[in-house]
């Protein structure tokens, strides 16, 4: 009997390999997701169209045919489906982005399709960086500036739908002009301590009017903030070339001037409002691509980099054996998303570990984003790569187990 009792403590001290579950995970119940039709239970093809377990739909802010990038720049239009994304959670999983890709073949001026994929990468880079210190992310409509001058709607040279945000409008003259816009400190019950705001313009300056060359500049300005673009490079007539370019700005609540020198006025109509939490938690992003029949891009992978983001790349093409169509119901992603069904012990690029062997300290830096190769239940000395933070819960569990075995032995001895 003594050997049986000694078995349990010796087992506890044995180093056991940890095999991560590849895919996103969460350590606490305070998590949320952002998605598209592959996580949208309101889609008529659901649940066959889902890449996530159906019971997780309430955890995701999702809209079929939409994306967070697309929704920031456009309103609902025949070519675009906009959605007011809104979700809150200390830990965040992003699985969207494919609805704006080379398949859409979008270009506004001379930047081309590749130029817009670069803008998509810039947007998601800033979104993921800002989201690490925010619990809530909410796309909001901004109040239109008052006392707008006479404006004519801008157009794309390609006859595509010009982005609605920011608004790019043609002035009736070239007198330097400013209008005020406000980034609010709250939206409903959501506190906005920061905003993700697009700043877009046509580059290379010098827009021609009546054969004359006019410089061009735009800016967002307040007493404590300035961001602008100015270019007077002459490009006249048929040689004149312009790219639609966007930068994505971290801006605080307040009143700003949108100013212009030249032909166009640019001001924002939407922003992603975010609050601020007192810890930094890297976000997780899953590769969002089409099946091989359509062109995809790697913007999500390029945007999601350590230390602010953990990227989960597919290892096979988008492949469906039991979905609603060739682009909904990928076998590999469905398997990857199973890790979201339960709390995990640690999160890393290699996956999550659904073992209750780690303390809640794993959500804080520098623990979040790493998992040990082995665990030892009691021993916390030595190499940090093979030991994890033990907790009194597990110590108590093993002590109780030993006590129960001893008690059973005593009872058996008493009746014998």
Curated annotation (Swiss-Prot):
Its EC number is 3.1.1.53. GO terms for cellular component: host cell plasma membrane; membrane; viral envelope; virion membrane. Residues 264-379 are annotated as: Esterase domain second part. It holds the Pfam family Hema_HEFG. Residues 415-416 are intravirion. The active site is at residues 37, 325, 328. It is an enzyme of class 3 (hydrolase). Glycans are attached at residues 76, 257, 278, 313, 322, 343. Disulfide bonds join 41-57, 88-136, 200-246, 206-213, 304-309, 346-371. One of its GO terms (biological process) is fusion of virus membrane with host plasma membrane. Residues 4-121 are annotated as: Esterase domain first part. InterPro entries: Capsid_hemagglutn, Hemagglutn-estrase_core, Hemagglutn-estrase_hemagglutn. Residues 1-14 form the signal peptide. Its main location: virion. Structural protein that makes short spikes at the surface of the virus. Contains receptor binding and receptor-destroying activities. Mediates de-O-acetylation of N-acetyl-9-di-O-acetylneuraminic acid, which is probably the receptor determinant recognized by the virus on the surface of erythrocytes and susceptible cells. Also hydrolyzes 5-N-acetyl-4-O-acetylneuraminic acid and N-acetyl-9-O-acetylneuraminic acid, but displays a substrate preference for N-acetyl-9-di-O-acetylneuraminic acid. Belongs to the influenza type C/coronaviruses hemagglutinin-esterase family. This is Hemagglutinin-esterase. The gene is HE.
């Amino acid at each position: 009997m003594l050997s049986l009792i000694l078995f349990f403590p010796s087992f506890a001290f044995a180093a056991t390999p940890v095999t991560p579950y590849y895919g996103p995970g969460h350590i606490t119940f305070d998590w949320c997701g952002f998605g598209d039709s592959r996580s949208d239970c309101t889609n008529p093809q659901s649940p066959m169209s889902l890449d996530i377990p159906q019971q997780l739909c309430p955890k995701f802010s999702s809209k079929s045919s939409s994306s967070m990038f697309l929704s920031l720049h456009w309103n609902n239009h025949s070519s675009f489906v906009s959605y007011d994304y809104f979700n809150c959670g200390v830990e965040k999983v992003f699985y969207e982005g494919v609805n704006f890709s080379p398949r859409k073949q979008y270009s506004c001026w001379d930047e081309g399709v590749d130029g817009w994929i670069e803008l998509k990468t810039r947007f998601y880079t800033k979104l993921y960086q800002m989201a690490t210190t925010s619990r809530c992310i909410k796309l909001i409509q901004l109040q239109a500036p008052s006392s707008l001058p006479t404006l004519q709607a801008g157009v794309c040279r390609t006859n595509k739908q010009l982005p609605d945000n920011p608004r790019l409008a043609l002035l009736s003259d070239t007198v330097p002009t400013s209008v005020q816009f406000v980034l609010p400190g709250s939206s409903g019950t959501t506190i906005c301590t920061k905003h993700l705001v697009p700043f877009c313009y046509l580059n290379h300056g010098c827009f021609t009017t009546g054969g004359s060359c006019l410089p061009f500049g735009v800016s967002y300005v307040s007493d404590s903030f300035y961001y602008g673009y100015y270019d007077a490079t002459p490009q006249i007539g048929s040689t004149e070339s312009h790219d639609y370019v966007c930068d994505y700005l971290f801006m605080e609540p307040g009143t700003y001037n949108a100013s212009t020198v030249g032909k166009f006025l640019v001001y924002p109509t939407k922003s992603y409002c975010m609050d601020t939490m007192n810890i930094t938690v890297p976000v997780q992003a899953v590769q969002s691509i089409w099946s091989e029949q359509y062109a995809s891009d790697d913007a999500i992978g390029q945007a999601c980099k350590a230390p602010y983001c953990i990227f989960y790349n597919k290892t096979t093409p988008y492949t469906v054996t039991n979905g609603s169509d060739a682009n909904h119901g990928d076998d590999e992603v469905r398997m990857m998303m199973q890790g979201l069904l339960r709390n995990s012990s640690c999160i890393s690029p290699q996956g999550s570990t659904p073992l209750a062997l780690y303390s809640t300290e794993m959500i804080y830096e520098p623990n979040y984003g790493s998992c040990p190769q082995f665990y030892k239940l009691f021993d916390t000395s030595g190499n940090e790569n093979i030991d994890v933070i033990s907790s009194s819960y597990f110590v108590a569990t093993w002590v109780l187990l030993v006590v129960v075995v001893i008690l059973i032995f005593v009872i058996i001895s008493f009746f014998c």
